[in-house]
Amino acid sequence: MARRCELTGKAVQVGHLVSHSNRKTKCRFLPNLCNVTLQSDALGKRVRLRVTAHALRSVEHRGGLDAFLIKAGEGDLSQTARLLKREIHKKLAETPAAAA
């Protein structure tokens, strides 16, 4: 399983820990990944995703999973999130047609 956020694409970074004497030690910086279940209002179902804490705050800020995915670019999303985004777009396109 890749250490990558399914919503933002954040992954492992490589860098140096630098001491006071400027000695550099190679280090891996891992993303803060959480297994969460998010509710999709448009689809009426819960979706389990592996996302970073930063992405979780962004989802809350945008007003839920549906709003986040609609605004998100396709490049950062995982395959699962892309399929979910397409399903949400289809469902939202059907809903106004049925109401009118």
From Swiss-Prot:
Entry superkingdom: Bacteria
BP-aspect Gene Ontology terms: translation
GO MF entry, a single one: structural constituent of ribosome
Gene Ontology CC annotation, any one: cytosolic large ribosomal subunit
Keyword flag Ribosomal protein: yes
Pfam families: Ribosomal_L28 (PF00830)
UniProt keyword terms in alphabetical order: Ribonucleoprotein, Ribosomal protein
HAMAP family for the chain: Ribosomal_bL28
Family stated for the protein in its record: Belongs to the bacterial ribosomal protein bL28 family.
Protein name: Large ribosomal subunit protein bL28
Organism: Methylobacterium radiotolerans (strain ATCC 27329 / DSM 1819 / JCM 2831 / NBRC 15690 / NCIMB 10815 / 0-1)
